[in-house]
Amino acid sequence: GGFYISRYNISKSSAGKPQSVKGVMPWVNINFDDAKKVASTIEDNEAVKSHLTFGAEYDSVLKWFIKTEIKTLAEIAEDSTEWGNHWSTENSPKKVVETGSREEWCANNIYDFAGNVDEWTQEQNASSFRVIRGCNFYQDGFYYPVAFRGYNNPGYFYYGTGFRATLYIK
């Protein structure tokens, strides 16, 4: 058992296949249902199965950052400005950038978790809306730290919203 979360936001290869690689634009303008479907196609064999990240998995990664002392609770729950692409980040490009663009936006070898694009998860709020985690480039990491839970209609898509995949180890 256990899981791995993708190192980079999911992007689309030149052949249209989902991938988690450095140096490409993240796959944005995708709604929840399509992100869930795409994430499930990345890997499925006798050892692992991919899926759109669950909220509990997202929380586990944040707890792992604290446990390994790579990030503090304050950097996760109060202000993620310094380790993500946010509107208020120093030298911010103020737009979505290629995955893995800056080493300071990396924690435990996971890039852009705190900013660049916010991310669909399978978590559902009290209504039928789906939870979007983290923050995107257009938001402030102080108001929307990485632990922030936004939400939207599953049919919503936006140029600042992408997703990650998780590999579940069977």
List the predicted regions and their residue ranges:
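Active-site-proximal beta-strands of protease catalytic cores
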Residues: 114-122
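Short hydrophobic-acidic sequence motifs that mark active-site Asp/Glu residues
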Residues: 2-4, 117, 162
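Disulfide-stabilized, aromatic/cysteine-rich ligand-recognition loop
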Residues: 29-43, 48-53, 62, 127-170
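Short aromatic-cysteine micro-motif
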Residues: 1-112
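Acidic glycine-/aspartate-rich tracts in secreted/extracellular proteins
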Residues: 9-12, 122-127, 168-170
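Residue-level recognition of short, solvent-exposed, well-ordered loop/turn junctions
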Residues: 112-113, 160
